[in-house]
């Protein structure tokens, strides 16, 4: 595995596809090299191409607002793009461009080794889903996976809408904000985890790790056990985070 400095030098010198002919700057990833969260956008915009920095245009302002609402500092995360050069006229990335540029993204993932990958928008989500052998719906239905946490091959994946979706009057504004706020949960375990039966069952080898990663150390606010615990409601030890029961845990 190459060093982060060596990787950025290679990215900045890249002339492997047609995009090198129209760009001003190549955008390397930036942020916390020990980040637990790694945001992956599609490609730089015009402002980013001119200044050589991530998320500084209108979408960047929206992202900053979303991070504030999620109580997350930019210094806590690492940000990068699937495509490192601006796409002319904001066109869609071509398959050969994705194939060439994704090698750099794969190196970044190995170097940063975040606990959670957060692809923003369709093309970034499509690539990450394919890389980790997950099924993604068609582009017209891709919104159904946004805000849903996945766990595969030892990595969490939380696809989100691109901040640009809020540049106009989007009827899904509140949903998008809620989805972004889920990032904060991924930085800390459920407060009930130390005494939760799920932890004991997992440590005893009786419970699949996915339950721990998706709920206890993931989207724990959606956990039925968490909700009932918060409300002081009775729930059996063998009830799973999604509200179903596993009688094998009752034995």
Where do the language-model regions lie?
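A polyanion-binding, active-site-adjacent surface
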Residues: 1-184
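Cysteine-centered metal-binding/redox modules
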Residues: 185-251
């Amino acid at each position: 595995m190459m060093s982060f400095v060596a990787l950025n030098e290679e990215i900045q010198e890249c002339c492997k596809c047609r995009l090198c002919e129209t760009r001003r700057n190549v955008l390397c990833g930036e942020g916390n090299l020990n980040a637990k969260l790694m945001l992956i956008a599609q490609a730089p915009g015009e402002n980013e191409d001119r200044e050589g920095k991530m998320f500084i245009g209108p979408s960047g302002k929206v992202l900053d607002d979303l991070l504030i609402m999620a109580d997350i500092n930019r210094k806590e995360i690492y940000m990068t793009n699937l495509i490192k050069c601006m796409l002319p006229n904001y066109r869609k990335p071509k398959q050969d461009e994705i194939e060439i540029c994704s090698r750099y993204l794969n190196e970044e993932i190995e170097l940063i080794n975040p606990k959670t990958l957060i692809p923003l928008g369709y093309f970034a989500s499509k690539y990450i889903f394919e890389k980790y052998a997950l099924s993604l719906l068609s582009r017209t239905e891709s919104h159904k996976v946004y805000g849903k946490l996945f766990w595969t091959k030892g990595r969490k994946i939380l696809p989100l809408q691109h901040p640009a979706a809020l540049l106009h009057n989007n009827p899904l504004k509140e949903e998008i904000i809620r989805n972004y706020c889920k990032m904060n949960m991924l930085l800390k375990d459920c407060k009930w985890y130390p005494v939760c039966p799920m932890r004991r069952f997992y440590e005893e080898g009786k419970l699949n790790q996915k339950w721990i990663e998706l709920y206890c150390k993931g989207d724990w606010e959606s956990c039925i056990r968490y909700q009932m615990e918060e409300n002081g409601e009775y729930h059996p030890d063998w009830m799973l985070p999604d509200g179903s029961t596993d009688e094998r845990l009752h034995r």
